Structures are given as C-alpha cells and as structure tokens.
A protein has these predicted regions:
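Core nucleotidyl-transferase/polymerase catalytic module
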Residues: 1-176
C-alpha cells in the first residue's frame, strides 16, 4: 500500500476496494480494478519484505504475478471451476486430497465404519469434479465396498448436486 496515492491509504478505501478472506497463510483477495495497479500480489509481497516477512503464492513457486482470475487460484486446497451444467462456480477440493481421504482413519473407532464415512464424504466431493470424474471413481468405490459387511450410501451424481443445491440455498427443499 506504500505506493498507493494518499486517498487510498486508509482502511475505508481498503474496505471499499478489496474483499479478503484469510485462514492462516492462505488467502483469497478480490481487488477492484481501480486499485489493482498499486495493490496486488506483487505490491503485497514488497510490503511484507519491507517489514522482514516473506509473502508467497499458494504454490510456493516464487513466480508471482500481479493478479489472477478466480479460476486460476486455489484457497484451502479448493479450486474455483465454472460448471456448465449448473451455470455457476463450484469449489472442488483437490482431487488428490479427495481420493486420499478414504485411506485414513483417526482414533480408536470401527475401521470399516469410519472408512465408509470417509468414502461417503469423498463421494460428495467427487461430485464437485463433474459427472465424468464422479462416475469413474464411484464405480471403483462400489467395487471395493462389495466385500464390506456394511455398505456406504452412495447417491447418484444428480442426487449429490441436488442435495448441495438445497444445502447452499440455491433450491428450496420440497419438505419445507
């Protein structure tokens, strides 16, 4: 912000031109066009450097650019992808994380029961990756769970998308 004109060096100006969400060292910042030339990822990194801190991009690549579009960033291992079927952005969790979650159970619990819970959560997360990815992996999940004493409840792709739409208020449940 040190390069910003005096009118923009206030919290009022910051709040009027910047929307920011942050968790630990991960952040997502939307910057208005009006201030993007003097408040962007490069100037933020410079400001941090002036106070002895290092600011990195989420990939820790060291190749920072002034700004990127929503579809070019990730936040807390979630990307922002436009979904043509639903005509909106979805925030799928990194596919590697989704697939890995079924391999881990914490605590002193029934291993099969916790694995089923993880698979059900993973199946929902797969639905955020699109129909083709979902169908590919859910078929594998069903094949693996045939030997389980208890069976996971796997919805169809469309059912997961419907449930998610109700959950986030894009549809009103017929039950209400």
């Amino acid at each position: 912000m040190l390069v910003a004109p005096a009118d923009f060096r206030t919290m009022k100006a910051f709040n009027a031109n910047v929307a920011m969400v942050s968790y630990g060292d991960d952040n997502c910042i939307n910057i208005s066009d009006e201030v993007s030339e003097f408040f962007n990822q490069l100037t933020i990194a410079d400001g941090y450097e002036q106070i002895g801190m290092v600011y990195t991009d989420e990939l820790k690549s060291g190749e920072m650019v002034p700004y990127r579009t929503l579809s070019e960033i990730t936040y807390l291992k979630r990307a922002f992808k436009w979904d043509e079927e639903e005509h909106q952005y979805l925030a799928p969790l990194d596919l590697g994380v989704v697939l890995e979650m079924i391999n881990w159970v914490r605590g002193d619990f029934d291993l099969e029961e916790r694995t089923i819970e993880n698979m059900e959560t993973s199946a929902f997360e797969l639905s955020l990756h699109g129909r083709e990815v979902f169908e590919h992996w859910i078929g594998k999940y069903k094949q693996v769970t045939r030997t389980f004493e208890k069976r996971p409840l796997f919805l169809t792709y469309d059912e997961y998308r419907y449930v998610e739409a109700i959950k986030y208020g894009r549809l009103t449940s017929a039950i209400n």
